[in-house]
Design a protein with these regions (language model features):
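Glycine/proline-enriched, intrinsically flexible loops and inter-domain linkers
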Residues: 1-605
Length: 605
């Protein structure tokens, strides 16, 4: 864990790219296959979007040199692991150099602005084989592998071709511009070398030492493999509810939920990452006067002169996948969207990305679960009008040790990016001022299945949270309008730990108390529910919203027709007080105690 954090820190900070949003999820089934997701978003002028290599263009590799590190990296990451993997596959791990990457990035942008290349791609999975193969798909290419700059001698032409060594880009440069292109790179001391050309023959020809070592038809290379057919087994889960013990108070339970690794503060990670570099981060990972409360999403201002910004958030709910992968995927999408909506993003101008990490899809039950999750992505992208613009997958995440096979949980990370129309309306989650009203928006259902409270009780089964395809987009749109109209002072989505945890996090961030009546929360198809289920259900599409007294009437009028209720007020005292059925006090704790529990889990890491 520390190695992952230091890797992201050292590379990201040195690149001068702010690390502004993230999440951490623990499950013992990740022990053999720990997952790390890193993503970057950038701004590009429209005139630079369309890029394509042309017949006669030269193939140029620039940046770091090629070595044996990263050989079969994609193959390694796509296969099942065992006790010997660390020793026999260590060469599959690339060795990064952030300074080299930063120099390459800067000079690439300079060359772009001067119009010195026609196309560019990175050397990712498969190295030069994928980069050149993809760029030359419709043209064909001839590559002289002995011209590729090497870190050291002794590499075979196969190793040169498939090495995934980092910090390398491949460019298509017209012969008329190659002199200027190479001069720009040389001026910044970034190595750039012509290794071939795009031919127009439709074939991929590889040369080494004066002889041809490969000759493939591009159509065969890209479309020659027959479509793979596998068997999928679609299990329809049967939900069996569990009993929740009735208690006089749930304060201790709330403190325990706040301390759970998947809920607790990740400040020890956040503080190591530079989220201020470039000076465009408006909303940061931690919010409130003491910068201790959790932010729902980051808001960036990439164009200093513009009133508009970009919100970046994410959603991930692996525990739900144990019960139903379809609703796990739907919940991840809903979470990512409500995170960006909570900070002021327009849900109708939001795009999604998916990252699937799964077990061995040769096994029918694993593939069946993947099919169900993919169906949910389709269904809810259409329901929300939010397109998937990119994505990635990593399959076969299974580990065999001592004769026991361990498969990771079905894992889908959804990232959301949305336009914030008015940066001045960007909203944080911390409670702001005593006397303000606190509203809940959305419907609470009896959905403790896969929840953190269920984990606390060591309870299996229950009903997994679902998403209402018709109602959820309406709630997002209405709430966004209220935020844009300046009717809200704080907004926080209800997620891990449910209503009680969200209220606690707002109190921690604002260093204020609250008095809430949980029994007033809108419920699904019933007039009352056990206190514990109202407090800790992780139903989707819900928010806690703080509204100033002089805007309560306007907010209520604006949200008319949506499920919402006024639960209580922000108080100047330290205590979070929550009342349940019959007006009985079921939670009381000062924000200092809540903060201590929330921050204590990883204190000293």
């Amino acid at each position: 864990m520390r190695g992952v954090v230091s890797g992201v820190r050292d590379y990201g900070n040195r690149m001068g790219i702010p690390t502004v949003n993230g999440a951490v999820y623990f499950d013992e089934r990740y022990t053999g296959n720990p997952l790390v997701y890193c993503g970057t978003v950038g701004l590009i002028q429209k005139k630079h979007v369309e890029k394509a290599a042309k017949k006669g263009d030269l193939v140029v590799v620039a940046g770091g040199r090629t070595g044996r590190d990263g050989i079969h990296g994609a193959t390694f990451s796509s296969g099942e692991l065992d006790e010997k993997s660390e020793m026999v596959s260590s060469g599959a791990v690339q060795i990064g150099n952030a300074i080299e990457e930063k120099r390459l990035l800067d000079v690439q942008l300079a060359a772009r602005d001067r119009g010195l290349y026609n196309a560019v791609t990175d050397c990712g999975a498969g190295g030069l084989s994928s980069a050149v193969g993809e760029m030359g798909e419709t043209l064909g290419a001839e590559i002289e592998l002995d011209k590729v700059p090497l870190k050291y001698q002794g590499l075979s032409y196969t190793e040169i071709w498939i090495s995934e060594a980092q910090e390398r880009m491949v460019f298509a440069v017209s012969p008329e511009k190659i002199k200027d292109f190479l001069a720009v790179f040389a001026a910044e001391d970034v190595e750039a070398t012509v290794i071939g050309r795009f031919t127009g023959t439709g074939r991929l020809a590889l040369l080494y030492g004066g002889r041809q070592v490969a000759d493939l038809d591009m159509k065969f290379l890209h479309g020659g493999m027959p479509r793979v057919v596998r068997q999928a087994k679609l299990d329809r889960p049967v939900f069996r509810d569990f009993t929740v013990p009735a208690k006089d108070t749930y304060t201790a339970d709330l403190l325990r939920v706040l301390a759970m690794p998947n809920v607790a503060s990740k400040e020890w990670i956040v503080r190591q990452y530079d989220h201020e570099v470039q000076g465009g981060t408006i909303l940061k990972p931690l919010v409130g006067p003491g910068r201790a409360g959790p932010g729902d999403a980051a808001v960036l201002a990439p164009l200093p002169a513009s009133r508009r910004g970009v919100a970046v958030g994410c959603g991930c709910a692996p525990k739900f996948g144990d019960l139903d992968p379809y609703w796990m995927a739907a919940s991840a999408i809903d979470e990512a969207l409500r995170n960006v909506v909570a900070v002021g993003a327009d849900p109708e101008r939001t795009a999604l990305l998916d990252n699937f990490s799964w077990g061995n899809t040769d096994k029918p039950d694993r593939l069946g679960a993947l099919v169900r999750a993919a169906e949910a992505c389709r269904d809810f992208a259409l329901a929300f009008g939010a397109p998937f613009i990119s994505g990635k997958d990593s399959l076969n995440n299974e580990y065999t040790a001592g004769g026991k096979n361990i498969c990771i949980p079905h894992t889908l990370l959804i990232s959301a990016m949305g336009i914030v129309p008015e940066l001045i309306r960007a909203t944080t989650s911390d409670a702001k001022s005593p006397g303000d009203a606190v509203f809940i928006v959305g419907v609470t259902a009896d959905e403790l299945g896969g929840s953190h409270y269920a984990e606390l009780l060591d309870a299996r089964g229950g009903t997994v949270p679902r998403v209402d395809k018709k109602l959820a987009p309406q709630i997002f749109k209405k709430l966004h309008g209220a935020i844009l109209a300046g009717l809200t002072r704080a907004c926080h989505d209800l997620c891990e730990g449910g209503l009680a945890t969200a209220a606690a996090e707002m109190c921690i961030g604002g260093e204020l108390g609250m008095e809430l009546d949980a029994a007033k929360a809108p419920l699904l198809a019933r007039s009352s529910m056990e206190d514990a289920r109202v407090l800790f259900s992780e139903s989707n599409t819900r928010f806690l919203v703080e509204v100033a007294p002089d805007k309560i009437a306007r907010f209520e009028k604006w949200m008319a027709g949506m499920p919402f209720a006024r639960l209580g007020t922000v108080t100047g005292g330290p205590d979070l007080v929550i009342r349940g059925n019959g007006g009985k006090e079921i939670v009381r704790a000062p924000w200092q105690d809540l903060k201590k529990a929330w921050q204590g889990t990883f204190k000293g890491w």
